[in-house]
From Swiss-Prot:
<comment type="function">
    <text>Component of the PAM complex, a complex required for the translocation of transit peptide-containing proteins from the inner membrane into the mitochondrial matrix in an ATP-dependent manner.</text>
</comment>
<comment type="subunit">
    <text>Component of the PAM complex, at least composed of mtHsp70 (SSC1), MGE1, TIM44, PAM16, PAM17 and PAM18.</text>
</comment>
<keyword id="KW-0813">Transport</keyword>
<keyword id="KW-0999">Mitochondrion inner membrane</keyword>
<feature type="transit peptide" description="Mitochondrion">
    <location>
        <begin position="1"/>
        <end position="33"/>
    </location>
</feature>
<keyword id="KW-0653">Protein transport</keyword>
<dbReference type="InterPro" id="IPR013875">
    <property type="entry name" value="Pam17"/>
</dbReference>
<feature type="transmembrane region" description="Helical">
    <location>
        <begin position="106"/>
        <end position="126"/>
    </location>
</feature>
<keyword id="KW-1133">Transmembrane helix</keyword>
<dbReference type="GO" id="GO:0001405">
    <property type="term" value="C:PAM complex, Tim23 associated import motor"/>
</dbReference>
<keyword id="KW-0812">Transmembrane</keyword>
<protein>
    <recommendedName>
        <fullName>Presequence translocated-associated motor subunit PAM17, mitochondrial</fullName>
    </recommendedName>
</protein>
<keyword id="KW-0472">Membrane</keyword>
<keyword id="KW-0811">Translocation</keyword>
<keyword id="KW-0809">Transit peptide</keyword>
<dbReference type="GO" id="GO:0030150">
    <property type="term" value="P:protein import into mitochondrial matrix"/>
</dbReference>
<feature type="transmembrane region" description="Helical">
    <location>
        <begin position="68"/>
        <end position="88"/>
    </location>
</feature>
């Protein structure tokens, strides 16, 4: 019965352009109701601030350093396990070196390889634990690196009295440190232009 009433009213309310006024009204109200029923307009996505970015950046560095230490220890222990089971003739040389020296060099090499593979593990752990903030962090990271690249100095003018200030911006962990880095870059440029 309700449908019949709408159809009857629909036939009566035909506008000048041939489109039903009721259809337009229902469509407008349906869209408004749909928009009010969702939270899309009410909650804007929280954009990551610079202090949050620097906090996550520091967390990533801690993850990378800790995983480098852990993988270096694992690799040294693995090499120790391997070398301790070898039968070595003390009268023979290994690659022209004393066996004890060769084994020590092998263990140091394994520790170095473990240390270098650590950031791969650390980055994977950081990505797994950072969750929904990861995309915003990566966008901020690109923005930050673009700012660093734009403002960094030309290292060709360096000297003992005028060293290059943190070329890659690795030591910047806060906004005040970034501002200090900018001041150091401007000071470097000024000194380089005055003394050349």
């Amino acid at each position: 019965m309700l449908r019949l009433g709408i159809n009857l009213q629909n036939r009566l309310l035909v506008g000048l352009n041939g489109q039903s006024l009721l259809k337009r009204a229902v469509t407008r109200n349906a869209v408004a109701i749909r928009m009010n029923s969702t939270n899309a307009g009410k909650t804007a996505s929280h954009e990551m601030t610079w202090p949050e970015f620097f906090k996550l950046r520091k967390k990533e560095r801690v993850f990378n350093t800790a995983s480098s230490v852990a993988t270096a220890i694992v690799f040294v222990n693995g090499s120790w396990f391997y070398f301790s089971t070898l039968e070595i003739d003390p009268t023979q040389t290994i690659f022209g070196f004393d066996p004890l020296m060769a084994i020590t060099a092998g263990m140091i090499t394994c520790a170095a390889v473990g240390w270098l593979l650590g950031p791969i593990v650390g980055t994977a752990l950081f990505k797994a634990t950072s969750g929904p903030k990861l995309l915003q962090f990566q966008e901020k990271q690109l923005s930050f690196l673009a700012k660093i690249q734009k403002n960094r100095v030309n290292p060709q003018s360096q000297s003992f009295s005028n060293p290059v200030p943190d070329y890659y911006g690795e030591k910047i962990n806060s906004i005040p440190q970034y501002r200090q880095w900018l001041r150091d870059c401007h000071s470097y440029k000024r000194k380089a232009s005055e003394f050349l």
